[in-house]
């Protein structure tokens, strides 16, 4: 619910501000007067990303330690279904030989899903606690709605793409792939390099921006509903959108995982 002291524009802007740390002075940034500098980090995005990553590790480790060959509990059954689903996806889409891909795909799917799931929390709950209890100037709780987080994850995937490309094809083979495709003639090397370079770089960019765009839009719609409508009518739109958003949350985690598997499978193909 929007604060009585805020206009709808102020309310929306307030919820789109990150809690930032200026690395030059190690002080919190005033969200209403941010410095024009590269040396800031969104510590709320980093905090929730790390906490949710640790939550994933704790939950899955606890299930693995308590796993039984008898009749599993509901939580163990759910975890086994997720693992089986991810493992099946990897077997269907990854045609190379690597023990890293399945754990990586599982980590990506669950971690991104948990980050996306934060979007279903009441929009004012944690920011209110942060402001009135902890005295923080701003707080955003959806890490995947921060382009820095999604592009950082995509950068990690890009590094793996380069690693597997060089590992499977060698530096010479990878160089030939960039310079002699699609036109297999030395005269077209500059053209091939541009085309293949753009194609290669577009993978992490599109991977990161796709997740960011969908989650940012979802977060913004929740903020608009809370900021522009009276409290008694917000449920009329909030509940249907939240139900639909559950599909978006799961789908975006799945798409990020699938594209990662596909890109790494392409990088692992020997020519």
Curated annotation (Swiss-Prot):
One of its GO terms (molecular function) is proton-transporting ATP synthase activity, rotational mechanism. Belongs to the ATPase A chain family. One of its GO terms (cellular component) is proton-transporting ATP synthase complex. Keywords: ATP synthesis, Cell inner membrane, Cell membrane, CF(0), Hydrogen ion transport, Ion transport, Membrane, Transmembrane, Transmembrane helix, Transport. Key component of the proton channel; it plays a direct role in the translocation of protons across the membrane. NCBIfam families: ATP_synt_6_or_A (TIGR01131), PRK05815.1-1 (NF004477). This is ATP synthase subunit a. It is a multi-pass membrane protein. The chain crosses the membrane at residues 40-60, 100-120, 146-166, 220-240, 242-262. One of its GO terms (biological process) is proton motive force-driven plasma membrane ATP synthesis. InterPro entries: ATP_syn_F0_a_bact/chloroplast, ATP_synth_F0_asu, ATP_synth_F0_asu_AS, F0_ATP_A_sf. It comes from Escherichia coli O1:K1 / APEC. Its main location: membrane. It is found in: Cell inner membrane. It comes from the Bacteria. F-type ATPases have 2 components, CF(1) - the catalytic core - and CF(0) - the membrane proton channel. CF(1) has five subunits: alpha(3), beta(3), gamma(1), delta(1), epsilon(1). CF(0) has three main subunits: a(1), b(2) and c(9-12). The alpha and beta chains form an alternating ring which encloses part of the gamma chain. CF(1) is attached to CF(0) by a central stalk formed by the gamma and epsilon chains, while a peripheral stalk is formed by the delta and b chains.
